[in-house]
Amino acid sequence: MFKRSEKVAEAVHELVSELLVKGLKDPRIGFVTITGVKVTDDMHLATIYFTVIGSDEEKKATEQGLNSARGFIRKEMGKSFRMRYVPDIVFKYDASVEYGSRIESILKEIGSPEHDDNDKENS
C-alpha cells in the first residue's frame, strides 16, 4: 500500500516534468530530466532531483533557473492538487547518473580485450 507522500511525490514528478516541457520559459533551464521526487511524510517539503546535460556552468545556471521558478511551480501545484498545504520545493542536482556512467565506463575498460591482453602478459 502506498503512503500518501509517495502519491504526492509521483504527482509532483509528473507536474514538474510537464512544466519543464510546456510552462517554464527561463533560458537558463537547459535539457533537464527529473530523476526523482521525495516528499516528507508531513507534506511540507518536496525535494526534486534533476539531471542536466552540459558543463558545470550550465548545471549551475539550470539549478538557479529552477530555483527562481519555485514560486511559479508551487502556484501550479496549488491549482492542480487538492491539498490543504502545498509543499515547499527544493531542487537538488542528482549526480547518480554521472556516477553510474563513470562506473560503466570503468567496467567496459576492465572488460576490454586490450585489458585482457595485458593481464595475460603479466601472468
Curated annotation (Swiss-Prot):
Stored PANTHER family: RIBOSOME-BINDING FACTOR A, CHLOROPLASTIC-RELATED (PTHR33515:SF1)
Record keywords, A-Z: Cytoplasm, Ribosome biogenesis
Transmembrane segments: none
Gene: rbfA
Domain of life: Bacteria
GO cellular component: cytosol
GO BP terms, alphabetized: maturation of SSU-rRNA
Keyword Cytoplasm in annotation: yes
InterPro entries referenced in this protein's UniProt entry, alphabetically: KH_dom-like_a/b (IPR015946), RbfA (IPR000238), RbfA_dom_sf (IPR023799), Ribosome-bd_factorA_CS (IPR020053)
KW S-adenosyl-L-methionine (keyword) present: no
UniProt GO molecular function: ribosomal small subunit binding
Protein name (Swiss-Prot/TrEMBL): Ribosome-binding factor A
Entry's localization field: Cytoplasm
Function: One of several proteins that assist in the late maturation steps of the functional core of the 30S ribosomal subunit. Associates with free 30S ribosomal subunits (but not with 30S subunits that are part of 70S ribosomes or polysomes). Required for efficient processing of 16S rRNA. May interact with the 5'-terminal helix region of 16S rRNA.
Family classification: Belongs to the RbfA family.
